[in-house]
Amino acid sequence: MLPTVIEQSGQGDRAFDIYSRLLRERIIFLGTDVNDQVADALVAQMLFLEADDPEKDIQLYVNSPGGSVTAGLAIYDTMQQVSPDVITICYGLAASMGAFLLSGGTKGKRLALPNSRIMIHQPLGGAQGQAVEIEIQAKEILYLKETLNSLLAEHTGQNIQKISEDTDRDHFLSPQEAVEYGLIDKVVSNLNSI
C-alpha cells in the first residue's frame, strides 16, 4: 500500500500518493528490479521533468538489485539525453544494472548514503534451445558485456582491462570504495545538501 500525502489549499484538500508528490519535487525512484515496465515509467518521468523544466536537476534514487540489461540501457540512454542533470543517489543496494545506472548520473552528482552498498558484475544470461540459438545468445551477451564495460570505463576512468577483471565475479564496494573506483563522486549523510 502506498502512503498518501494530504495537501491543503484554498480549494480544499488534495491527496497524492507519495511518489506523485515527490515527482513534483523532481525526485524519482528505482526501487525494484529493472524491467521493461520500470524502464518505461522512469523514461516517462524523466521526459516529463525535462519538458517541465529543462534546466532543473532530476534526482534519481537507486535501490535496485539490477535486472534486464536492455531495459537498463533504455533508462541509461534517456539519462544521457535529457537536458537536466541527473543526480543519482544510492540508498540500500545498487547492484548490477542498478550500479551501472548509479554511475551513469551526471559527473560530480553521483552520490551514495554512508551505509549503502554497490556491486558490479558482468551481465548474466541463460540460453537454451538448439546449438545455433545458444550461439546467437552467447554472441549477444558478449556484445552487451563489452558495451557495459566500455561505458563503465568511460564513467569511472578505469581502463577496460580493470573493469573486465573486476566484473568477472560479483565485486562489492562500500560507498567510499565506490568513490575511489570512480563509480560515484561523493558519500553524503545529509540529503538536504543536494
UniProtKB/Swiss-Prot annotation:
UniProt GO cellular component terms: cytoplasm; endopeptidase Clp complex
Gene Ontology biological-process annotations: protein quality control for misfolded or incompletely synthesized proteins
PROSITE patterns in the cross-refs: CLP_PROTEASE_HIS (PS00382)
Keywords, comma-separated and alphabetical: Cytoplasm, Hydrolase, Protease, Serine protease
Catalytic residue list: 96, 121
Enzyme nomenclature, EC number: 3.4.21.92
Main location: cytoplasm
Role description: Cleaves peptides in various proteins in a process that requires ATP hydrolysis. Has a chymotrypsin-like activity. Plays a major role in the degradation of misfolded proteins.
Family listed: Belongs to the peptidase S14 family.
Assembly information from the UniProt record: Fourteen ClpP subunits assemble into 2 heptameric rings which stack back to back to give a disk-like structure with a central cavity, resembling the structure of eukaryotic proteasomes.
Protein name: ATP-dependent Clp protease proteolytic subunit 3
